[in-house]
């Protein structure tokens, strides 16, 4: 039975690595996958899912106006799809999460989404909010704070390594711009305790 999955975490937990491994596992068994990533995230090149450990795969892009159900349904007319995998799923809209649930419910294709749960202000992203609400299965991928505790928050940093507390929710960046931390160190660095 097909399901909608959401694998979530803070940054540097291996979400893209896990997605790429899942896609490889399907393809190794002669099953086809459709891999998507957000057009907004071009850190490693447009149309690529790339892991920090150096592996990558070409991907279709989703933008705010992309109708994922229609696009996947069109692709099915050309070839069978055994699994859909979505990287940077926090950037999905509410409507796109609903479309992915239709891929599961109407097309009977499993959809595996990977993304951040919250932003640098500890607020849910739109895509994450609706995946947390509507996914059939949720799984947290864990990483650690510099103190060794589980990291479940992310700090945004400026060029001098100082914490930024305000700004646009979406700012594409990697290890130079963000730091995954535990709740205690998030509160400390944000001046909340």
From Swiss-Prot:
Q: How does it assemble?
A: Homotetramer.
Cystines in this chain: none
**Catalytic machinery residues:** 88 (proton acceptor)
State the PROSITE patterns in the record: TK_CELLULAR_TYPE
Q: Where in the cell is it found?
A: Cytoplasm
Entries under PANTHER family matching the protein: THYMIDINE KINASE, THYMIDINE KINASE, CYTOSOLIC
| InterPro entries documented for this protein | P-loop_NTPase (IPR027417), Thymidine_kinase (IPR001267), Thymidine_kinase_CS (IPR020633)
Q: Quick one: signal sequence residues? A: none
> What's in the keyword line of the UniProt record?
ATP-binding, Cytoplasm, DNA synthesis, Kinase, Metal-binding, Nucleotide-binding, Transferase, Zinc
Which top EC class is given? transferase
Q: Name one GO molecular function term.
A: zinc ion binding
What would be the name of the gene that encodes this protein? tdk
Any one Gene Ontology biological process term?
A: thymidine metabolic process
A GO cellular-component term linked to this record: cytosol
Q: What is its EC number?
A: 2.7.1.21
Instruction: Enumerate the residues binding Zn(2+).
Output: 145, 147, 182, 185
Q: Which reaction does it catalyse?
A: thymidine + ATP = dTMP + ADP + H(+)
* Binding site residues for ATP: 9-16, 87-90
Q: Which family does it belong to?
A: Belongs to the thymidine kinase family.
**Name used for this protein in its record:** Thymidine kinase
């Amino acid at each position: 039975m097909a399901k909608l999955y959401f694998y979530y975490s803070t940054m540097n937990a291996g979400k893209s690595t896990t997605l790429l491994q899942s896609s490889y596992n399907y393809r190794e068994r002669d099953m086809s996958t459709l891999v998507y990533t957000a057009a907004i995230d071009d850190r490693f090149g447009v149309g690529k899912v790339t892991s920090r450990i150096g592996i990558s795969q070409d991907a279709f892009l989703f933008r705010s106006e992309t109708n994922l159900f229609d696009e996947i349904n069109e692709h099915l007319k050309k070839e069978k799809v055994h699994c859909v995998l979505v990287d940077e799923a926090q950037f999905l809209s509410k409507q796109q999460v609903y479309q992915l649930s239709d891929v599961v419910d109407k097309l009977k294709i499993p959809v595996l989404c990977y993304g951040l749960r919250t932003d640098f202000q500890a607020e849910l992203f739109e895509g994450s909010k609706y995946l947390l609400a509507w996914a059939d299965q949720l799984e947290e991928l864990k990483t650690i704070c510099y103190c060794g505790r589980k990291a479940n928050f992310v700090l945004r940093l400026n060029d001098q390594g100082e914490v930024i507390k305000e700004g646009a929710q979406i700012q594409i960046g990697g290890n130079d711009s963000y730091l995954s931390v535990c709740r205690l160190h998030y509160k400390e660095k944000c001046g909340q305790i």
